[in-house]
Amino acid sequence: MRIGILTSGGDCPGINATIRGVCKTAINHYGMEVIGIHSGFQGLLTKDIESFTDKSLSGLLNQGGTMLGTSREKPFKKGGVVSDVDKPALILQNIQEMGLDCVVCIGGNGTQKTAAKFAAMGVNIVSVPKTIDNDIWGTDISFGFDSAVSIATDAIDRLHSTASSHKRVMVIEVMGHKAGWIALYSGMAGGGDVILVPEIPYNIKNIGNTILERLKKGKPYSIVVVAEGILTDGRKRAAEYIAQEIEYETGIETRETVLGYIQRGGSPTPFDRNLSTRMGGHATELIANGQFGRMIALKGDDISSIPLEEVAGKLKLVTEDHDLVIQGRRMGICFG
């Protein structure tokens, strides 16, 4: 069997470990041939490929990014690397001409939607969920999330010392456009006093009162963790806006920090390395068993899979009854 593998959308720690898990299992256990497709779906349009061997996969486990490269090419939308052609039809033709029996797609929500469409067209597809945002429906955790939370938590830890030294409020902005999982998990792990996520409405006066109450209790500094997506009207960056409003409400010197793309870079955590390896191996097992049109998922501590059509177009969001939100409120943390 000849399988292709691609990575699409934004990069994150753990992609290379997943590629390694898929390919080493395919080559060493099942005797399959594996073809790497460069730059996501763009590579399927241009036939930009390479053959993998066991040797070529050495050293991948701890590397960030993706050895295959990635792009945001959308095969079902106009534009991109090729124009004035039926891109889905061209991809189907190229898959046949390259002799691919199956394609493994590693990506986020957009990739899952695209994979579901190709599966509906008869392409043998298996997908692996990848995002630092942890917002892919159907899996408890996506690889990349733990690494991003670790990076954000380390930054929050460092801000505690400078905030306490200057008796300031420090606002740190983390990634999460529609889902606040990174803000929630890093905010709780880093001892944030205020945690703002897109899913829970906030009130600046409530936030200001929380900070002033801390001051009355002899706590002269505060840490505020915000997800980038809490602002919906495009006024400013979330951290900048919240910092200005807090300083206006409280009169306390407030500074902001935006972590940005640093959350996507660097080596994956041990948890993500193991999760990626397991997910990659399970993807190859599905292929060997002829189970296509499915996305790998983590349920509890078990790796399973679910139909792609159940995943496409859905988001996994933070809810107010999530255990961490409930526990945070019990401890006096303000969620807005």
UniProtKB/Swiss-Prot annotation:
Binding site for substrate: 131-133, 168, 175-177, 228, 255, 261-264
Binding site for Mg(2+): 109
A single GO BP: canonical glycolysis
Organism: Bacteroides thetaiotaomicron (strain ATCC 29148 / DSM 2079 / JCM 5827 / CCUG 10774 / NCTC 10582 / VPI-5482 / E50)
InterPro entries xrefs: ATP_PFK, ATP_PFK_prok-type, Phosphofructokinase_dom, Phosphofructokinase_III, PKF_sf
Record-given protein name: ATP-dependent 6-phosphofructokinase 3
Pathway terms, separated by semicolons: Carbohydrate degradation; glycolysis; D-glyceraldehyde 3-phosphate and glycerone phosphate from D-glucose: step 3/4
Family membership: Belongs to the phosphofructokinase type A (PFKA) family. Mixed-substrate PFK group III subfamily.
